[in-house]
Amino acid sequence: MAQTIDPHLQLPPHQDFAALRDEAVGFLTALDGQPWTDFNPSEPGLTLLETALTGLVDLGYRLDHDIADLLAPAAADEAWQALPDGAAALSCEPVSQHDLALALADQPALSAASLAAAPEPGAIDVWLTPRRALDDREKLAARQAAWRRFHRQRPLGLRPGRIMVRDKASLYLFPELELSAAAPAEETLAALILLWRQALQAPPVYQSAAACLAAGQSGDTVYDGPLLEQGVRQDGPAADGQALASRLIDLALGLPGVARVDSLQFSAAPAKETLSDRSDGVWSWTAPDNSYLLLESEELINWWSGAAMLKGQNFDPLHRDGQRLRVDAARLRALLAAQAAADAAAPALPPAFGRYRRLSDFPAFSPALPAQFGLSGPSPGASAQEKAGLSQLQAYLLPLEQLQANQAAQLENIRQLLELPRGDWLATLSALLAKMQASESLSRADIDAFWRAAAALPPSTLRQPVSPLPLAEDLLAADDLAAYRAAGAETALETPLSERWLDRTLRRLRHLLARFGESLPDAAQLRYRGVFGHYAAQLLASGSALPIPADALPARLAALKQALDLAGFLLDFPRLSAARGSGADIAASLHSRSGLEWRLARRLGIPLEHSPLSLGNREGLYLVEGALLPRRDGSAPPAEEAGRLYWILPSYGCRFGNDAFRRLVEQAICEETPLHLQAMVCWLDGAALNQFERLYRHWRAKWLELGGPAAPSVPGEADWRADGAPQSRRARLWDCSQMLADALAASAIIPPFDPERWLSHIGRDEIGGSFTLGYADVPVLRPATPDGKIGDASRPYVIAVSAPLPLND
């Protein structure tokens, strides 16, 4: 169908050619005594004005493209998003107990999860409510899934206590119904079962994010809390475990197709075990404690189809116009199954890809002028005076054309201004600067790699040539024409790693970060210049170095490191923001980190790696939660200690050895630590940090044994309350945790310990021997022995660690 333009369409000012033309002409004709006072519609200047306005309106039109189009990449098949989508930017890991309950209940077999404070400080007991009857295998699977999800999305300072599944309390209903004459029996009864099930069991309702947004819900509401796999859970009343006959009868009578409810009998047993008594006076039924009410809809189907009868039954359960009625049980089951399948929902919106608009394409408007202007080329018989006039006109138009061409080129830069940073240079430069932070020496290959990455920094096109340029040879001298074309054809006006590039990049990244309400300390507070000043001469000595003054390179390296920090924070913003209150998944990996660790490290430019810090001068940190330090007898830590977060950092290093920087770290820790938890900061020297890392590695391994591949078949309460045999996983965890808790409480003085007693014996019954879980112990730092030999146990081979470089501010 053909589309027409709305005659009442109101264009924005930057797209309204007629309004712009009238305004410009009115301004010119109002100039008393100036040219164009006697306005003539055939004035050639008016044509030039209209042509220039056409270019301006074209730029305005391009600016009004959808944001997705402005950010679309040039490659049509490039599956890349410029900014995080709503699901990533607005959702978060569980923060409140309500959030955690929603995440734990996000299983198809579960209706809800409720949390209760356990007797031990820092522990949370979980009750799981199924949607339907579960066998023992399904209950175990639900508990294990909840236990793993609790660890994966665990809030700081909490650990799972007992994880229990409520038992079902079956409710059998035996209603006597009169259906309306025109009501389809199976459809009416299927709708009635769904109504009663909703009232008695309150099953969760999930909708897709697209459906919620289409219904008028805001993005903040749709993506509030954790992102669930089943979709967006809708608020609704919770099941109270009670059935009231009056309520069920009202629901039935409100359904089209049900004419009358003659009786309604409750029972906790199926029909064959229930005595028929329509006048027993039971009008309510309550589920026992720690159980959930389950409507046995299959028995209802059998009851209405005649496959089930009460003891002593002498009436028909279903009739129409006084006549006995039987339903098709297979069709009724199919209708219920189809409704269950229709309840499935998608968790998030599909990504929206924009259309690449080639914003930098700007055709020069000189060739589009009428032929009488002569800019397409002078006639063969033109005089020198006529050619000079044409060249003068072209010279007048060239600045305007160049200006609009540059504006079109800068429109192409919108994507670079608004998109997240990307490219191989991020990882390459970050790794090399991390080596400098660790006071490590740079190899020739490292230096060459640095300059290659610096030369590949993403440029910005700030101007482009006017093409085509008529009469260019007549307008400019040969040398000037070559210089203009060379300068106009450049893709970037900035030297890589120049002050202008760094300043613009930092402003752009800070602006993007501010849109998320975030800001990072500046380079002066982070003391980067004092670190990189040691490497300026070595970097500039390379043959591939860029032409940068020696005294300017440390400041530019500091600005580059801050740009990398901002870029890394933006790229990881969904995780750094959503998981800022989440603990480490200690049951899944030896090296998993809490969201708070990642966030603090990103803020301060601290690289986080898996290798031990005590074997060099690398920067890093550790976080130990007091709630995860059970005592040697298996008891939980006291409430005061359970609410502590222990931060362990090296007291040496180029930056960490500086008092001002350590104060900045402690200030950031205080700002980022949740208010309900107490931060304890431990600064350790090399020897103490080495002892801590050895102890920490064993402690993490004990947690991994408890919840990893060797996890018990029934996780949760059994892991904490079963008898701790000498070689049990629980006993080793308790013993190791007690040692770590004592060390952290004793002003971070790590005493000697014997890790042999913590070695795993989880395979003793299977292979008759002991083995470790698969983690390497942290090497012990010992005094160097000049005459030692490799392999000599009494004189171990030691790698000497050089002293860290001092800050060179």
Specify the residue positions occupied by each region the protein language model found:
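A short, surface-exposed helix-loop junction/capping segment
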Residues: 64-88, 220-235, 644-650
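Membrane-proximal bilayer-interacting regions
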Residues: 204-285
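Solvent-exposed, conformationally flexible loop/turn segments
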Residues: 277-292, 296-299
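Extended, charge-rich low-complexity interaction segments
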Residues: 705-753
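Single conserved position on a long alpha-helix in the C-terminal lobe of the eukaryotic protein kinase
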Residues: 33, 39-42, 46-75, 84
